[in-house]
């Protein structure tokens, strides 16, 4: 499992490339909400640069370096608030019919995001993995038009698609 809250596809691709260095998954499940999450041009460029030049990823780290960082024992003290979870015990159900009313239209997927998804699929194929699209239940972020958009993309790419928002 490799995911973070509000993850964009540029970061998904970066994490997937890193995972493939040590792992050989048989199935890769891509949560579809990210496919509709806009990746701003500036962020896409920065992510690509950070993959190739560590100075962009760790550009402020030099300010806090000490000799102990080079010579001492490694202490992993940094945490990323986007990774992990927040325990939340409240349960509030919903009626799927309220937000998943069938429509004929399909929500448009940003072209840049389609390119990211196709790159993920290419890496899956090269590494013997099957790409599966999954829409987790989400009455706030999901609707039938988005379902139709992902369904069309899945058919075009030959991917399996599971939408848990449907009855």
Feature-to-residue mapping (PLM):
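C-terminal regions of proteins
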Residues: 148-149, 155-167
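A short acidic, amphipathic alpha-helical/loop segment
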Residues: 13-19, 119, 146-149
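Active-site-proximal beta-strand/loop segments in catalytic clefts of secreted hydrolases
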Residues: 2-4, 31-33, 134-137, 164-167
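Membrane-embedded segments
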Residues: 1-59
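Loop/turn elements at helix/coil->beta-strand transitions in domains of secreted/extracellular proteins
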Residues: 24-27, 125-132, 157-160
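Hydrophobic helix-cap positions at the C-terminus of alpha-helices
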Residues: 19, 123-124, 153
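Secreted/periplasmic serine-hydrolase-like ester/acetyl group-modifying domain
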Residues: 32, 38-130
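Acidic-and-aromatic substrate-binding clefts and catalytic sites of carbohydrate-active enzymes
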Residues: 6-10, 109-111, 139-146
């Amino acid at each position: 499992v490799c995911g973070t809250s509000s993850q964009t596809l540029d970061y998904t691709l970066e994490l997937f490339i890193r995972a493939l260095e040590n792992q050989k998954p048989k199935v890769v499940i891509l949560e579809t909400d990210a496919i509709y999450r806009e990746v701003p041009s500036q962020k896409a460029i920065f992510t690509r640069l950070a993959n190739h030049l560590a100075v962009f990823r760790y550009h402020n780290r030099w300010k806090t370096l000490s000799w102990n960082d080079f010579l001492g024992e490694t202490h992993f003290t940094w945490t990323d608030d986007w990774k992990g979870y927040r325990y939340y015990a409240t349960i509030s159900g919903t009626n799927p019919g309220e937000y998943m009313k069938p429509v004929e239209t399909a929500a448009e997927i940003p072209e840049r995001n389609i390119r990211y998804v196709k790159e993920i699929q290419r890496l899956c194929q090269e590494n013997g993995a099957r790409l599966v699209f999954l829409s987790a239940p989400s009455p706030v972020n999901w609707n039938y038009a988005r379902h139709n958009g992902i369904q069309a993309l899945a058919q075009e790419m030959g991917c399996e698609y599971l939408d848990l928002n449907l009855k």
